[in-house]
C-alpha cells in the first residue's frame, strides 16, 4: 500500500498539479523608460504601418523574473463556493498594442500590409474582419500615475484563451491592478478573466483590440489553417475555441468547412477525402492540446544573462551582439524559404502511385503522404458537396513557374509582421547569381529601376529597403513553382536536447533499451561507444593532439614540423587508436555482445525538443515550431486513418457523415498509436489541486469594480493531460542492400578500383597542406602539384638539405598508408583535424571487425552559420530609407560601408555542436511499419532526409568530379543546419568539460604511460613527462604531489621522488632533453638480465576432510572446521 501511495504521488507531482490558480492572462503596462527601444526592437516583428507586434516572453523585458509559465485559469463559476479551472501554459509572445510607434521596425520597407492582403485574396484565403463592437479605450486601462502617452501596453495570454482574446470574450478587472518589478522597474498588470465567469455581463469591461486580433489571425491562425489545408481561418478560430472551452477534443470540428482539390472531388475519391479530413481533425485535436499543456520555464527566457552580452560594455555593443545573433538565426529561415520541400510549402494529402518495374514492394502504411508543391496553391478547391470553395488563382497573376513576392507572403501566412521578420533575415543572405540570369546587376537596379515611381510598394521613395529590391537580389535562390509528384521529406526547424548521438556510429553499443535483465551483474563492465569516444578524445588531448593543424604549430605542441616528426605523430595516433579499438572489441566479446548483428541497426539520433519555451525567441521560430508539430502529428495520423477506413469503407459517405460515425473511435485509438511508438515521446499527467480551499475574489463585487477576497473550491475541467517531450529523428547509418533500388545501392557501394588521386583524397592531405612549408622549406612547388604528380608518376622531388633516404621513407609512409586507408575506409570523409583522423580510423576498425566492408556508411554534416562583414555594394539595405538619384549616387553612398552577412561552414563537427542545444533545420520523412514476428502494432520512424532545391545553401551543391567519380555519391552525406544556443544565449553549464586543468592533463598523460608501457624505463619516462610539463616547478614537488599525478600507481611515488632528487642535485635547465640524458646515464643496462619461462604449479590450499563427520559437539562443529583451516 505504501508503494502504491508513492507511485500515485509521483504521478500527481507534476507541472500541472503545481500550477497555481489564476487569470487567463494579463495586460502589462510598462513605463516608456523601461525599454531600450533600439535594442528590444531587434527581438520583435514590427513593420512600418503596424498597429501591433509581439516580443518574446523574456524575464526582465516583458515579464517579471517570478513569472509562472503555467496556470489553472479560472473560467467558470459552478456554484457559490466552487470554480472550474482549465490548465494551460502561456503563449510565448507578449503582444504590444499601445504606443507601438515608439519601437523601431524590424524591416523598413513600406507596403507589406497591402502585399499580404493582395496575396491573401489571390490564393483564396479568408481575410481578417474586425468585430462590429468598438475597440477598448486604452485610456481606461492606463494607471492613474502615468499619462497614456508615456505607457507601453502589452497583452500576455494563455495558449487556451487566445481565441477568447481574439473574439473579445475576456474581461479586464481594473480593480485588481497591481504592480510587479521587471528589471528594477515598477510595471503594472491587470488580470484577464473569461466573460463566462460573471453573471452580470452588461456592465463588464471587455477587452477587444482589433490590432491584436488581426495580429493573431494572420500570424497564428492563418498559419495553422495552411497546415490543415483549409482557407477559412475565421472558422478555424471558432473551432479551436469550441474545442478548448467546451472540451470538444473528441468531436470533428473542421470537416464542415474542409475543402478538397477539384481533381479529388471530381473523381469522387471519398477515401482520399476522408483520410485528408481525419488527418486534419486529429492534427487539430492533439496538436492544440499539446500546445496548451504545461511546460517548464527555461534559461533561454533569462534575457539579461544571455552569453552574447557577457563582454558588452555599451549600448552599441549590445546592439551589435544582438544583430549578430539574429544573423546566426537567419540561416534557418533561409533554408526553409529556399527549400523546395520546406514545411511552408506542404499543402496536400496525396496517394503514392506504384512505381512501374520496381523491385521494392509498396508499403501500404506509407501509401498516403503529405505533399509539397507551390503550384498546388493555384488549384481550384471544392467543399465535399461540390460547391466551390476557391475558384483558383489566374495564371496571369503570377510569373509562370517562377517564385514571386505573393509566394513569399504565403510563406509568411499573409502576416505583415512575419513577412517583415522574414525580410529582415533575408537581408543577411548572400545571393547566388544564376547562369540563366546574366542581366543581374543590383547596382544598376537600385540606381535606375528601383527608384522609379512605377514601384507599387514604395513609389521609388526608398528603393534601398523596398521588398522588391530585396527580392530582385535573391530571386535566383528561391525554389521553382512546381506541382508535387512524389513522397519527399519535409523540412522542420526547432531546438534539440543536449543528448543527441551524432558520432560516426551514432547509438552503436549504447546498451540502452536492450538489457533484458537490468539486475544482472557482469564480470566486465559494459564499455559503451560513447565512453570509447570520450576516452579517445581525452588521450588525444593529453598528447596535445586535439586542434586542427596550423602551419605555426607542430603536432605535439609548439615547434616546427619535420618529416620524422610528422610520421611519428601519426604513428603515435595510430597506435593509440588501434589499442583503444582492440580494447573496445575485446570488451564486447567478453560481454557476449553480438556486435556484428547489432551494428546493422545503428542510427544517428537527434532529439527535437517540444518545450515551447526552449524555442529560439523569435516569432518566426515559434511559427515553425507550431507548423512542425502539427505537420508531424498529421503525418503520423495518415496510416491509422488508412487502416481504419479500409475496415470501415467511406464509399457512399461524405466525409462529414463518415466522421460523425467514426471520429471518436479514431481519436481514442490514436492516443495509443503514436505516443512512444518510435517518433514522439510524451508523458501523461494526472493533474490534481492540492489545496482544499484557494484564495479568489467575489465575482459579483468585481463586476462593480470592487475587490473582495473569498475562499473557493477548485474543480479541474480536465484531470488527465498529455504533454509532448521529444520527437526522435533517426538516420540509418549502414546501408541495407535488400529491397532498395539499384540507383540507391550504387551510391553506397564501395568499389574495388583505386582512385588515381588516392593521396589527395586520403587521410593526410589536410595535414600535408598545412605543414607543407615546414616539411619542405626549400621546395618551390605547391602541395597540390607535389602530391598529384607523385600519384600519377611516382616521382619524388629533390629537396636541398634532406637526404634521399629520409624522403623515400616519408613518401613510402604516406603512399602505403593512403592506399591502406582507401582499402578499409567506409566513411566518405576527408579528416581535417587530429580528432577526426583518429575517430575515422577508430570507426573504420570497428566496422571492419563487424564485417561491414561492402557499403559506405552515411555521415552527418553540420552547416554552421558564420557572421561576416562584407562590402555593402550589393547590400543596399545598409542605406536605410534614403532616396537614390542615380547609379553614381548609390555607389558613392555605399562603397565605403560594410554589411553584416551570414556565411555557412562545414568545418564544425555535428557531434560537438549537438551537445550545445542547437537550433536545427533538417528534412524528415516519417515512415510507418508493423512490428516483427506477427506483431500487428503500427510503429513509426522519423528518418533524416535530403534538402531539395539548388538555392538552399552552397554546401549542398554537388561536388565536382575532382575527387569522386562514383555517381550519386552525394547520398552518403546528410546535412543539418545547426546554430548552438550554448555560447550564444546560454552560458556553458560545465566549463571544466571544455577546459581541463593543466594538472589533469599531466595526470592523464602520466597514467597512460604507466598503463601502456611495461619496459624498465617507464619510471624515467614519467619523470621526463613531469619535467616536460612542469619545467622548473619539478624542483618543488613533494611526495603528495607525485602521488596525485600517479593516482592508482601511487605506491611508486618514492621511486619517482628519488629520480627527481638526482635532477635537483645537478641543478640543470629542467628541459625534457636534459632530464632524459641525465636519467639515461644513471641507468644500468638491462641487456645482461636473462628471463626464463615461468611454469605455474597447481598447489592445493588445504587438504580438508569434507566427509561431514562430526568432530565436536553440534554447537562446536563450525568452529572445529575453521580450526582445521590453515589460513
Curated annotation (Swiss-Prot):
GO annotation (BP), single: DNA replication
Subcellular location field: Host nucleus
GO cellular component: host cell nucleus
InterPro entries membership: DBP_sf, Viral_ssDBP_head, Viral_ssDNA-bd
A Pfam cross-reference name: Viral_DNA_bp
Family listed: Belongs to the herpesviridae major DNA-binding protein family.
Functional note: Plays several crucial roles in viral infection. Participates in the opening of the viral DNA origin to initiate replication by interacting with the origin-binding protein. May disrupt loops, hairpins and other secondary structures present on ssDNA to reduce and eliminate pausing of viral DNA polymerase at specific sites during elongation. Promotes viral DNA recombination by performing strand-transfer, characterized by the ability to transfer a DNA strand from a linear duplex to a complementary single-stranded DNA circle. Can also catalyze the renaturation of complementary single strands.
Quaternary structure and interacting proteins, as annotated: Homooligomers. Forms double-helical filaments necessary for the formation of replication compartments within the host nucleus. Interacts with the origin-binding protein. Interacts with the helicase primase complex; this interaction stimulates primer synthesis activity of the helicase-primase complex. Interacts with the DNA polymerase. Interacts with the alkaline exonuclease; this interaction increases its nuclease processivity.
Record protein name field: Major DNA-binding protein
Source organism (scientific name): Alcelaphine herpesvirus 1 (strain C500) (AlHV-1)
Lineage: Viruses, Duplodnaviria, Heunggongvirae, Peploviricota, Herviviricetes
